[in-house]
Amino acid sequence: MKKIFRTLCAALALTVCLCLPAFAQEAIPAQPAAKEDKVVTDLTGRDAFLRDVKGFTTNFGGPYVFAQADHKSPAEPYGAAPAEGSVATLRIYTMSDDKGDASINASGHAFVSVTNVSDRDINVGGLLIAPGKAVTIGTRGNRSEHSGIWYDLESYYMYYIPDYYYHLYAMQTSLDAGQLEVLNRGLRRADHWSACYNCSAFSEAVWNSVCADALSAGRPASPANLQADMLAKYSDKTAYEPPIPYDYAVYYGCALTPSREFA
């Protein structure tokens, strides 16, 4: 009987471990981007429209819930040196031209990136990012593999299709270890997307949780609104069409599943 009990306990413990979300487990090293010599294309015309319609009508995620850091950093000019004591730089990007993201007005895309400015690996969403390396983070509802949070998908597109995100604007702020933890806690609850709570709502929530200079994506949220607010408030801190590094493979979801489609 004791042997059976021990066996059942062991099986239960194994099941619990397997079912733990990625953020409850030890962070994993992000795998370097393959950067294969290949031609990558995306849907256009009617096919892109139908993909957006499907995303618009089949995803119903709610608001992005990010706690507010107990201290917030000011916005900085894009490319500025990180503030003293920082471990990372957070950048927010937005473009208002339609490129297939099914947001409420089907126009544009918004996302963020985190760059490691420390001398050791940092945990971003469960991925270990090496010093000097960066990862992009965004949400989408119109990709067949997954609806929700994606890591380095934007980097993948910009590497293989350099004009994929054109007329892109960006600004940045610095993160210390405590602010990075606030961001990570929010990412654990951000694996969803909907027409109202879309990529721009996600980017706004991330930014405002740690930056004292707030941005608004409007209501309903859209990349166009986010871009307009960024340029109206902080035009002296924005960069136009900044480079997007492609350091790591593409992952999606809280389970950090490596993408097959975007490998």
Residue ranges and their predicted role:
Residues 173-179:
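A short, structured loop/turn motif at beta-sheet edges
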Residues 18-32:
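Sec-dependent signal peptide cleavage junction
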Residues 39, 87-91, 174:
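Ser/Thr- (and often Asn-) enriched beta-sheet segments in non-cytosolic proteins
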Residues 11-19:
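Bacterial N-terminal signal peptides
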Residues 25-28, 37-65, 181-263:
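Activation targets extended, charge/polar-rich intrinsically disordered C-terminal tails
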Residues 49-167:
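Glycine-rich catalytic cores of cysteine/serine-nucleophile enzymes that process amide/ester linkages
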Residues 1-9:
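Bacterial N-terminal signal peptides that target proteins for export
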Residues 97-101, 166-172, 185-194:
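Second-shell loop/turn segments in exported
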